[in-house]
Amino acid sequence: MQRTGGGAPRPGRNHGLPGSLRQPDPVALLMLLVDADQPEPMRSGARELALFLTPEPGAEAKEVEETIEGMLLRLEEFCSLADLIRSDTSQILEENIPVLKAKLTEMRGIYAKVDRLEAFVKMVGHHVAFLEADVLQAERDHGAFPQALRRWLGSAGLPSFRNVECSGTIPARCNLRLPGSSDSPASASQVAGITEVTCTGARDVRAAHTV
């Protein structure tokens, strides 16, 4: 475009046109000519062939729908499971945890009692150990006297006194009488063969003797 003296543009030679129009592409021009030369039946046949070669979406759509339904069922199962877990959690928080706290407090009291009992058992064991040591010491200190007394009695030749079984005690003021004898006191040789002892005191004392 060129401007004239009056300021109005006027067309000039090959000025103001795009490069593709000034120099058209030969290949594109050939395709336009070929499309223009093709008859209408060929175009319709091409469209029918394209429709025939295009797969029908029915089977694929059905498969997708089945997949979506399966996912929805699984989602529903998951939601029901989540609700069940939520209800169980609420029950645990509201009911079971207070019971557990009470049991915990009770167990702490039991543990304290067990600790006190263990301390008492240790103290008793300590005292028993001391008492046992004292008993052993007393046995060591006084155990020789009864043994010496038994040895002395055994060497004295008085076996009759070891076999006397008495049902009572004989008072100091008591006269021994043998059955069938006189009222005089019995001698030591007669006492050795006593089968029955009678006392003139307030009560009778009976003894059995085995020679």
From Swiss-Prot:
Keywords noted in UniProt: Chromosomal rearrangement, Cytoplasm, Proto-oncogene
Annotated site residues (Breakpoint for translocation to form BCAS4-BCAS3) in this chain: E60, A61
Cellular component GO terms held in the UniProt record: BLOC-1 complex; cytoplasm
Ranges where the record places region Disordered: 1-21
Protein's cellular compartments: Cytoplasm
Tissue occurrence: Brain, thymus, spleen, kidney and placenta. Overexpressed in most breast cancer cell lines.
Main location group: cytoplasm
Family: Belongs to the cappuccino family.
Disease with which this protein is associated in UniProt: A chromosomal aberration involving BCAS4 has been found in some breast carcinoma cell lines. Translocation t(17;20)(q23;q13) with BCAS3.
This protein's name: Breast carcinoma-amplified sequence 4
Species assigned in the record: Homo sapiens (Human)
Lineage of source species: Eukaryota, Metazoa, Chordata, Craniata, Vertebrata
Gene encoding the protein: BCAS4
